[in-house]
Each structure stands twice: as structure tokens, then as C-alpha cells.
């Protein structure tokens, strides 16, 4: 252990030596840079950009660029970065975490690597925890960047897409972590590439990096859509399919558990739902509900595939026969079963897109962060983000007095002592900051101070604007400020007049947080830039952390010695508290790591889908090649399921292939039984694909190329988006129920990975099948609008247009059942005058 500590200590010393050497090189250019005029200094930015274009790396430019940014800060802001700030800037440029104590000027430090990395033209994101800080830093530091000829954008929640696009197009963009994540998700839901706002993710500097990458790591960002407004369509589809007759209206393929409507079944469906063509894009929802109702009624059996318990449909594992609690069938099949069994149909709000901060920030080419407290989480930063934590020495020696903890037996005794201490210090004119773990604690102390008539401010992490003002004044003479631990981060407490003589800022902690890092943040509020200060934590044996880690013995010992109201100050207790904190931190790290392992499954799937969407949206020419691959995979699956080359021909189900092709890919009768007989499985596939190719060629002639391309995009985007949202929903249910599988020797994570993969494979096949069906069967209308995909609107001519004048129908005309009726109604012949014929 001693050897390990020595190694860590020595590597830290090595880091500091290297950083000091590099910082000295920058300082050596100070006179030369100071001699440049404002114009010449600005010209340096243009020169650097050209050098990057010609192949010089940012590392090559570091010393010169930092010297220019440093001189620029002096002229534009009146601030001249210290040597330690140059060192911090180098750490950030190298994609690591600079641990710099409160008051050491992290905001100014960040300007150096931000300036350097902005020269690449790829865009730099500066990330803060709230909009107030983003706004403040963009405004204050923007003066420097503009002075040096760089553009600065501020990305806020209230901005329109156009304004966001402009903000992201700037050299440097300030934003909150939430807004960045949501913009990424929204970009992957757009239907035109022009609607995307972000550029590829290049470099981000995260302020208060521990807060964003550790404390908020487990919080997923979720964009939810409304669930289907009504469950009535499931009930209607269920009622309809129960009126159908097997063979006449639908066919069942036992092997693949698929059900197809026949031509008669389709006609009945069109009449029942009062639509012209079930395969029109506007009717995808109806067709989907019918398909699921058919599957639920004619391929799924009660007490075999599922059971009904307590008004719920529960899935039965086909291999073990166990009930799989928490799992739901995807794509609406579960709701179709609920309609079939007459139980309550559950419709939750749908998750349309989701990502965690862990996975969002790991997509950047380079990531850096700064904070006053990261050393305690060093292992996590290294394992998960591949970032090292490097401690930067302070500019001036810290002279703050950190006192050992005071421990009381009861909470009441502790709070009384806290209030007495505040009153004494307040009387001397010493500013006091009281840190609490919970809001109710801050309110309790506030009421005790009111009774004593001590004027004070209470700060909860609710109002960012007001928060900064209160914190700014917290260092004034006699000020008393009560704050929950995280409140006011990012704003310095500067000491007012006459407070140094009173002892500087006194920080009083009312209990230990379960994380040492949060305690250290509170301590670090005092003693900034070599100022005097004092910190004191008050604990009681009834505090949650003490209760969790066995303080009963000590409590009874203190009571035995008659110390119920007195405090003890013991290094042993402080060490016990710290080891308890270490245990909690370890548990929390394990839990965040586990979240990441689960989320990685969805991350890999998300990347595949988002990449496919991006290719579709950006495609300039026809998507036929992609679509033909989907059709080929679908035909391959259907043929191999019904006519496998590994089975004797007498076991083949050629009629099943014809039923599927008639229902989904080609006009009825295009392929007959005679066409398929005496052929190999491969020949059958090729025959079907040749016929489909000819039908596709014919379809392409119906519209100009750019309009047909738009039709292909509409189909692909609608199918991919619908299936992906259903899949996320199914993965959510799988994740919720997977821990229930931890029976026997089953590892829930392994199960989640393998089942998640199977579900993804099934979704991809389902996308192939639906795209093939809609491309081949949908009637192409003119003026297709991709926007209608996003809104799920009808892809029909606008309603409300005057009805076309109907033409008389002559009996001697030969008209196909699916041809448009010549009367001009716009309906199919079979649904109009064909009925009379």
C-alpha cells in the first residue's frame, strides 16, 4: 500500500514538473507578445488557423497560442493568467481533469485551451451546470474571444432551432449539459438534415466536472412522446379479426407464427375501417393494429405463450415455463393480447429517445474538465472516461484552519451548538457560511436563528440568479448564509472590508455528506487565494451516515460518561466517518458502473439506428440499393422458412410463400404454384426477386426521380422511427424486469445483453419487412412531404378540396378490382362501382 501511495505521489510530482516547464516556455514569450499591437495580436488567430490547415497540430501551437490568449486576457479583461492557470490550461488541452481549488480562477484558465482548440474550426463546447453560469461566462469571456477574432455562441433552452444552429456554428459555444444532450437526441429525430443543430462533437470543457459526470451520471435524458391517445383501435382491430374465416380471409404459417390477410380479408378490412387501401401510408397504424390482432388471436395461446393474472397479461418463457414478470411483448402485441383477453389495456407514455450523460460525453473526440474536488473520484474518471485527475498547486499557500469534527450524542444538542457558534462569530463581525445536506435542515437552523434575532439568508438550489447574488454577499462583514451543499457552485465568495481581521470566512458543516468530495467543496469555500478562514463540521450520533455505520456503541459510551450535551473532538471518530464515506462512495461507483454496463447495450443499438437515419436523411440519390437489400433479406427469410434447402421438398410450404408474396410484395396472381414447383430454394428466391425488381422499375416511372427519392425516404424514416420507439419501450420493460431473473445462477446483465441483442435483431428484421411491404404495396401519391412522417399525418391530397365531378361508368370497360374507379371518385373500383358490378 505504501509503495502504491509513493508511486501515485511521484507521478503527481512528475506531472507538476512537466507542467511547470511548459508554463515557463509560455511565460518566456510574454514580452514578445506584449509588444504586438491589438491588430497584430488578432492577426495571430488567422495565422494559427492557416498553420492548422497546413498540417501543424494544436500541440505544436500550444506555447504560442497560450501566450497570445494570455496577453489577450490582459488587454480585454484586465486579467493576466498566473503560472498555475497556464498549467491548468495545459491539463485541459490534453483531455484530462484539472483539480484547482476554489478561487484559483478556473473560468479564466479554461479560456486558454478553449482558444487553442477553437483554431481547428471544429467547434468547442464549454459546459456548465446551469444557464445562469453559461450566460455569465459567455458574456464575460466572450469579450476576450471576440477581441481575438473568434465567435461565441450561447445555447439556451428557449432558443429556436435556427438560433441554436447559429450558436453551435460559432467557434465556441457555452451551454448546459442538459441542453447539449437533448439537442443531440432531437437532432436524431429530425426528418431533414437542415433541421439538425449540432456539428460533430469535437472538444468539450466541463466546468464542475464531478457534478456532471459523477453526480448526474445515472440520470438519463429522456424525450417522451404521448402514448397512443386511445386504446380503442386495439379493441376495434380485435373485434374485426374475430369476424374473419381462416383460409378465406387469412392464412396462418405455423412455422414462422405469421398470419397474412388474403385479398378477401383485405377487402373486408377496408370496408370495416372505411378506408380505400390498407397499404396506403396514411393507414399504417390501422394495418399495424390488424396485424398484431391477427397474431394475438391466431398464433398465441393462453396458458402456453402467456397467462392472465390480476387483470394483467404476463409472458411465459418458452424454454423454462416460468412467468417473465416485468417483460412485455413489443410493437403493440402485448396490447393486442390485452384486448383479446378483455383485460385493461396499458398504455404508458413512450420514450422516443434517451441517453445518459456518461454516454453522451464519451462521444466527444476529446473531453476535459475542471473542478475543486475530483481526486476522490479519480478511479471513476480513469475507468469510465479515460481522463486523469491532475492536482494543480494553488497560486498562494492555503492558510485556512480545518478543525477536527465535533461530535454530539443527539441532533438537538448538535444544532444548539451550531446556533451558538454562529451567534458568537456573527457578534465579532465574522462572515459565516452554514452548509446543510438537506433543505429541511436549512429551514430548521433558519427558524432557530430567527428566534435569536440573527439576520441571515437561506439558499436552496432553486433560484440560480438570486443564488449568485446571495453568494457574492456571503463574505461581507457579519453576513450569515445557510446553503444546501451544491448551491452557489461556480460563484466565488470574496471577503468584504474588515473581515480578514475577524478571521475570514467561517464555514460550518452541519453533518457529513456521504461523499467526501461534497464535504471538501464546502471546506473549499473558505480560504481562497491565501485568505484566512476556518472550517468546522458538527456531527451527531443520530446523523444518517453515523447511524448507517454503527455508532450505537459510541453513543452509549458518551451517555455513560455523562457527555449527552457535551461534544467530543476525536481523530478516531473522524477516521471512522471517513472510512464510512469511502464505503458509500465505493457502492455508488459500482452502481454507476452497472448503469453504464446496461446503458452500453442500448448505446450500441442507438448508434446503429442513428447512423442509418443519418444516411437516409443525407442521401442525395435514390435509396433503392438499401431498400433492395431489405427486400432481399425479407424474401430470403420467407423462402428459407417455408422451403429450406435442408428439408425434403415434400415438406415445403410453397402456398405459404405465395400467400406472403401476394399479401405483402406483389399483386395477387403474379406468382403461381406452377412457377415455384420443381425449383431449388435459391431459384425460388431469385424468381421472386426478379419479379419484385420489375415491379420496382415500373413504380419508379410513376414519379420524377427526386419525388420518388422522397417517397423512399418517407417510407424508411417512418418505419425506422416507429420500430425504434417501440424497441426502446420494450428495452425499458426488459430492464425493469431483468433483476427478477437473478434466480439460480443467472447473471441479469448477461441476460439483458443477450435478450436485448435478440430483440434488436428482431426489430431489424421487422424494419426490413415493413419497408419492403410499404415500398411495394403503397400507392404513390404526388407531393409527398417528409414532414408528414414526423407528425404522423396522412400522406393524402389535402382534405376539403372540391370533389372531382364523377364520370358515368360504362359496363364494357375491363377494370381491375384494385384499379381507380373510372367514375372519378378516387376510390378503388372494388369499393365503388365494382360493388354494383
Curated annotation (Swiss-Prot):
Disordered as annotated region, ranges: 791-837
Ligand binding (Zn(2+)): 821, 823, 832-833
Residues that, per the record, bind ATP: 85, 103-107, 492
Cofactor comment: May bind 1 zinc ion per subunit.
SMART domains: SecA_DEAD (SM00957), SecA_PP_bind (SM00958)
Keywords: ATP-binding, Cell membrane, Cytoplasm, Membrane, Metal-binding, Nucleotide-binding, Protein transport, Translocase, Translocation, Transport, Zinc
One cellular component (GO) term of this entry: plasma membrane
Gene3D superfamilies the UniProt entry points to: Helical scaffold and wing domains of SecA, P-loop containing nucleotide triphosphate hydrolases, SecA, preprotein cross-linking domain
Basic residues: compositionally biased ranges: 827-837
Enzyme Commission number(s) of this protein: 7.4.2.8
Positions with biased composition (Basic and acidic residues): 800-817
Membrane disposition: Peripheral membrane protein
Family indicated by similarity: Belongs to the SecA family.
NCBIfam families in the record: PRK09200.1, PRK12904.1, secA
HAMAP family in alphabetical order: SecA (MF_01382)
Name of the featured protein: Protein translocase subunit SecA 1
Native source organism of the sequence: Listeria innocua serovar 6a (strain ATCC BAA-680 / CLIP 11262)
Lineage, uppermost ranks: Bacteria, Bacillati, Bacillota, Bacilli, Bacillales
Gene field: secA1
Amino acid at each position: 500500500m505504501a509503495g502504491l501511495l509513493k508511486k501515485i505521489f511521484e507521478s503527481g510530482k512528475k506531472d507538476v514538473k512537466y507542467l511547470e516547464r511548459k508554463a515557463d516556455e509560455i511565460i518566456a514569450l510574454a514580452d514578445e507578445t506584449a509588444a504586438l499591437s491589438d491588430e497584430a495580436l488578432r492577426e495571430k488567430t488567422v495565422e494559427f488557423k492557416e498553420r492548422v490547415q497546413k498540417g501543424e497540430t494544436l500541440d505544436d501551437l500550444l506555447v504560442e497560442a497560450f501566450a497570445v490568449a494570455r496577453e489577450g486576457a490582459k488587454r480585454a479583461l484586465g486579467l493576466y493568467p498566473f503560472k498555475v492557470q497556464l498549467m491548468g490550461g495545459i491539463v485541459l488541452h490534453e483531455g484530462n481533469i484539472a483539480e484547482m481549488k476554489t478561487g484559483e480562477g478556473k473560468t479564466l484558465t479554461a479560456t486558454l485551451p478553449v482558444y487553442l482548440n477553437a483554431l481547428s474550426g471544429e467547434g468547442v463546447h464549454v459546459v456548465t451546470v446551469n444557464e445562469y453560469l453559461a450566460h455569465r461566462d459567455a458574456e464575460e469571456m466572450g469579450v476576450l474571444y471576440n477581441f481575438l477574432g473568434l465567435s461565441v455562441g450561447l445555447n439556451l433552452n428557449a432558443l429556436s432551432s435556427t438560433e441554436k444552429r447559429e450558436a453551435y456554428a460559432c467557434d465556441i459555444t457555452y451551454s448546459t449539459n442538459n441542453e447539449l444532450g437533448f439537442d443531440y437526441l432531437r437532432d436524431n429525430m429530425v426528418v431533414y438534415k437542415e433541421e439538425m443543430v449540432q456539428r460533430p462533437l469535437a472538444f468539450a470543457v466541463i466546468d464542475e466536472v464531478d457534478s456532471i459526470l459523477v453526480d448526474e451520471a445515472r440520470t438519463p435524458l429522456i424525450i417522451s412522446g404521448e402514448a397512443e391517445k386511445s386504446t380503442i383501435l386495439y379493441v376495434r382491430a380485435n373485434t374485426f379479426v374475430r369476424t374473419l374465416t381462416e383460409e378465406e380471409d387469412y392464412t396462418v404459417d405455423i412455422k414462422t407464427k405469421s398470419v397474412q390477410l388474403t385479398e378477401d380479408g383485405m377487402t373486408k378490412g377496408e370496408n370495416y375501417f372505411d378506408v380505400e387501401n390498407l397499404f396506403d401510408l396514411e393507414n399504417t397504424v390501422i394495418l399495424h393494429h390488424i396485424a398484431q390482432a391477427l397474431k394475438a388471436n391466431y398464433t398465441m395461446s393462453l396458458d402456453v405463450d402467456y397467462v392472465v393474472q390480476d387483470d394483467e397479461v404476463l409472458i411465459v418463457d418458452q424454454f423454462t415455463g416460468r412467468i417473465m414478470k416485468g417483460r412485455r411483448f413489443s410493437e403493440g402485441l402485448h396490447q393486442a393480447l390485452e384486448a383479446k383477453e378483455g383485460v385493461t389495456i396499458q398504455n404508458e407514455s413512450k420514450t422516443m429517445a434517451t441517453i445518459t450523460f456518461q454516454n453522451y460525453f464519451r462521444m466527444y473526440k476529446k473531453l476535459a474538465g475542471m473542478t475543486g474536488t475530483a481526486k476522490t473520484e479519480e478511479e471513476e474518471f480513469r475507468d469510465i472516461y479515460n481522463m486523469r485527475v491532475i492536482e494543480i498547486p494553488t497560486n498562494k499557500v492555503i492558510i485556512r484552519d480545518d478543525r477536527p469534527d465535533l461530535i454530539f450524542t443527539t441532533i438537538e444538542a448538535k444544532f444548539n451548538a451550531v446556533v451558538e457558534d454562529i451567534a458568537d462569530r456573527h457578534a465579532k463581525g465574522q462572515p459565516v457560511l452554514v452548509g446543510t445536506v438537506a433543505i429541511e435542515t436549512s429551514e430548521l437552523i433558519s427558524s432557530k436563528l430567527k428566534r435569536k434575532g440573527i439576520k441571515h439568508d437561506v439558499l436552496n438550489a432553486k433560484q440560480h440568479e438570486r443564488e449568485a447574488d446571495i453568494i457574492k454577499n456571503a463574505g461581507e462583514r457579519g453576513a450569515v448564509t445557510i446553503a444546501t451543499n451544491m448551491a452557489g457552485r461556480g460563484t466565488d465568495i470574496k471577503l468584504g472590508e474588515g473581515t480578514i481581521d475577524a478571521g475570514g470566512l467561517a464555514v460550518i458543516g452541519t453533518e457529513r455528506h456521504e461523499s467526501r468530495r461534497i464535504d471538501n467543496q464546502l471546506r473549499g469555500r473558505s480560504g481562497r487565494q491565501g485568505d484566512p478562514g476556518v472550517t468546522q463540521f458538527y456531527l451527531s450520533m443520530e446523523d444518517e451516515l453515523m447511524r448507517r455505520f454503527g455508532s450505537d456503541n459510541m453513543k452509549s459510551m458518551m451517555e455513560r460518561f455523562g457527555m449527552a450535551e457535551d461534544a467530543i473532538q476525536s481523530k478516531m471518530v473522524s477516521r471512522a466517518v471517513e472510512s464510512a464515506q469511502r464505503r458509500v462512495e465505493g457502492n455508488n461507483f459500482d452502481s454507476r458502473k452497472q448503469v453504464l454496463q446496461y446503458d452500453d447495450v442500448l448505446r450500441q443499438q442507438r448508434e446503429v439506428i442513428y447512423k442509418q437515419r443519418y444516411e437516409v436523411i443525407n442521401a442525395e440519390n435514390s435509396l433503392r440499393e438499401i431498400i433492395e437489400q431489405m427486400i432481399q433479406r425479407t424474401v430470403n427469410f420467407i423462402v428459407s422458412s417455408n422451403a429450406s434447402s435442408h428439408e425434403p421438398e415434400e415438406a415445403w410450404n410453397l402456398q405459404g410463400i405465395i400467400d406472403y408474396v401476394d399479401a405483402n410484395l406483389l399483386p395477387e396472381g403474379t406468382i403461381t404454384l406452377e412457377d415455384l414447383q420443381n425449383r431449388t430454394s435459391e431459384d425460388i428466391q431469385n424468381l421472386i426477386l426478379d419479379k419484385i425488381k420489375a415491379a420496382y422499375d415500373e413504380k419508379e416511372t410513376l414519379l420524377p426521380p427526386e419525388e420518388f427519392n422522397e417517397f423512399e425516404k418517407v417510407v424508411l424514416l417512418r418505419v425506422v422511427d416507429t420500430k425504434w420507439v417501440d424497441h426502446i419501450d420494450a428495452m425499458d420493460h426488459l430492464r425493469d424486469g431483468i433483476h427478477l431473473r437473478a434466480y439460480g445462477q443467472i447473471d441479469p446483465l448477461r441476460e439483458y445483453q443477450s435478450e436485448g441483442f435478440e430483440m434488436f435483431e428482431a426489430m431489424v428484421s421487422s424494419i426490413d419487412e415493413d419497408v419492403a411491404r410499404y415500398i411495394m404495396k403503397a400507392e404513390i401519391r404526388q407531393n409527398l412531404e417528409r414532414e408528414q412522417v414526423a407528425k404522423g399525418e396522412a400522406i393524402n391530397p389535402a382534405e376539403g378540396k372540391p370533389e372531382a365531378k364523377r364520370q358515368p361508368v360504362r359496363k364494357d370497360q375491363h377494370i381491375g378490382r384494385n384499379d381507380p374507379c373510372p367514375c372519378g371518385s378516387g376510390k378503388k373500383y372494388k369499393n365503388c362501382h365494382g360493388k354494383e358490378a
